[in-house]
Curated annotation (Swiss-Prot):
The lineage of its organism: Bacteria, Pseudomonadati, Campylobacterota, Epsilonproteobacteria, Campylobacterales. Pathway: Bacterial outer membrane biogenesis; LPS lipid A biosynthesis. GO terms for cellular component: membrane. This is Lipid-A-disaccharide synthase. Keywords: Glycosyltransferase, Lipid A biosynthesis, Lipid biosynthesis, Lipid metabolism, Transferase. It comes from Helicobacter pylori (strain G27).
Amino acid sequence: MPTILVSALEASSNMHLEELHRNLPEDYRFIGVFEGKNALYSPREFSIMGFRDVIGRLGFLLKAHKEMVQLAKQADMVLLMDSSSFNIPLAKKIKKQDPHKKIMYYILPQVWAWKKWRAKSLEKYCDFLGAILPFEVGYYQKKAQYVGHPLLDEIKYYKKDIKGETLVFMPGSRKSEIAKMFPLFVKVAQILEQNEGFKRRVLVVPSFFKGLDLKALYGEDIQLFEISYDAHKSLFEAEFAFICSGTATLEAALIGTPFVLAYRAKTMDFLIARMLVNLHYIGLANIFYNALNDETPGLGESQLHPELIQHFLSVEGLLKAYEEMDRERYFKESLRLREYLKHGSARKIANEMAFLLNLT
């Protein structure tokens, strides 16, 4: 029975982990940080956003790090997913403790956006790097392989046209994101009802919020919405979506649902990020769409979808994005993006895990 130490702190990572688990033999056992049985911590306990939040919870993070390094002694291999600030130092400590321990990093840090030096650290401490974007491999020397994009394993619904019946609102998976985004989305929903009549309004809630008091998390206005825990099905049925920055933006693009990205960080966090990150866009769909255009002769930089960030984010701006978006162009270009990413990654990662464990 192989035991795998898992560090999956993000909601999206756990969604990818669930699909990976389906492709593994039943006797594989997970320990560590993830959503499920035998977890040392739930990802909810790492729901941190911004530089100040990290400082405020430094004691907890150091404690969790120490416990994970100890837990690695029980594991046959280590699987790290995303969350580089936590996982790269963890890989370093585990390799120092046991140089022969096999470490796989799946969902790589965005070294193409900032901190390119992290690529060297990953190759030094990890045995296999699973790249989910075709262009990522070029940032590494030898240990990275393109394995496909996990969302193409997980998404079962793809639009054949841009028709839809509902408006979908996705204010994020962190409490701090919800506090900033949800009040704006409530106002947008109310104004659209006044202007266009009633439309079904669906609030997509992260699956790991099941069993929690949603009214305490979102406030009294949650009663204005239908609740869904199935993001993909909700996006498939939607005419349009209002989405906080994150993996959900790429999900919407691959499904073919028109949307606007909304994001507002603490001013200091945003200024620091702007100095460090060398990107024109923050939405994954826009980033990957422009990577595709870079590889296509005659195409320059352009947006697949609108982004409203910091002081550009307002109720008026969200309404304007909804009204003015060229839905026909968006749908056509979203199909190009889907073809670019092509296939899923769970089976490939499962095979690589078996190889690292010497089971093949």
